[in-house]
Amino acid sequence: MRKIYNFSAGPAVLPEEVLEQAREEMLDWHGSGMSVMEMSHRGKEFMSIADETESALRELAGIPDHYKVLFLQGGASSQFAMVPMNLLGKKGKADYVNTGQWSAKAISEAKNYGSVQIAASSESDGFNSVPPLAQWHISPDAAYVHYASNETIGGVEFQWTPDLSAVAGDNKNIPLVADMSSNFLSRPFDVSKFGLIYAGAQKNVGPAGLVVVIVREDLLDIPPLAGTPAMFRYKTHADNASMYNTPPTYAIYIMGLVMEWLKKQGGLTAIEQRNIAKAKLIYDLIDVSSFYHCPVNQADRSRMNVPFTLSDPGLDDAFLKQAQAHGLIQLKGHRSVGGMRASIYNAMPLEGVQTLVTFMREFEKNHA
């Protein structure tokens, strides 16, 4: 058993059971005599790994048959460009919801390919909330609406799925696109409500190097923008079962192990309850304390990333140093906001959060 609890925002902690299985299979996967790292991506051994990973994901998330699952490279940041390149089509315009730094990065990239309207924003309150759906303004001619379901830096999370039919007027069938990189598979979600979902793997489902895309098949018929390279066309990868080029094979293998681990935990409903309990422990401590502070609106607080500050920033270094001595690492907040951040993704055990909360109480007692 490892002696530390890793609260990194990503790449993040993986289930210990998964790492142990990967270690056992490192030199010889299922009697093949090969490591997964050495396998041909078109060989029967790896093809079975890829198929089983996709099947497990479809089962866990309830992905309908008319959606394609793509295993791609380039991380979620590549999707900031691929989404507009593939979905803008002749409309040339898209709506984006701005709830923080990752939303802003997606918006900035999309502007290279077409017109972007900000459908809603929480900038006025410092990105400490989620804009209510009633405040969204959907363009009648937008090709899609994009939002980030969880902002890892600001600790803001959508606790609901936007129902665009309620606010889109005549454009009620507009596709909803979601960057789910940091809360993917942390709770049940209805895939049929989305046109496209993308998620970098390195927070909740695997190691860095893999991005998962779930796309409704009809959207693959939209002609990509002129000059879009084959590698940046969703249809290229859908038509070739994510094997157009060599995919990130080992990352897909680890993701498959994580899918099986999630199933053993009871699936997404069970993991959601665990995530709620973990987040509640930290937020409850913060809310009764005058020593710790979280600026995020309570209804919009992230279950995955808990940002907090100390009443005296001069104690930050001492907090981090003493936390590390207690086996609690990677708690430093993002450089753009400072303070602390505890990322408590699916694989973070309840015991890790309990240990953190105990340390926070002790630190407050000694320094308040």
Swiss-Prot record:
- List the EC numbers from the record: 2.6.1.52
Q: Which UniProt keywords apply?
A: Amino-acid biosynthesis, Aminotransferase, Cytoplasm, Pyridoxal phosphate, Pyridoxine biosynthesis, Serine biosynthesis, Transferase
Show the SUPFAM superfamilies listed in the entry. PLP-dependent transferases (SSF53383)
GO biological process: any one? pyridoxine biosynthetic process
Recorded GO MF terms: O-phospho-L-serine:2-oxoglutarate aminotransferase activity; pyridoxal phosphate binding
InterPro entries the UniProt entry points to: Aminotrans_V_dom, Pser_aminoTfrase, PyrdxlP-dep_Trfase, PyrdxlP-dep_Trfase_major, PyrdxlP-dep_Trfase_small
Q: Which residues are listed for pyridoxal 5'-phosphate binding in this entry? A: A76, S77, W102, T152, D179, Q202, N245, T246
Keyword hit for Cytoplasm: yes
* Entry-annotated residues carrying N6-(pyridoxal phosphate)lysine: K203
Q: What does this protein do?
A: Catalyzes the reversible conversion of 3-phosphohydroxypyruvate to phosphoserine and of 3-hydroxy-2-oxo-4-phosphonooxybutanoate to phosphohydroxythreonine.
Q: Which family does this protein fall into?
A: Belongs to the class-V pyridoxal-phosphate-dependent aminotransferase family. SerC subfamily.
Protein name (database record): Phosphoserine aminotransferase
Its lineage reads:
Bacteria, Pseudomonadati, Pseudomonadota, Betaproteobacteria, Nitrosomonadales
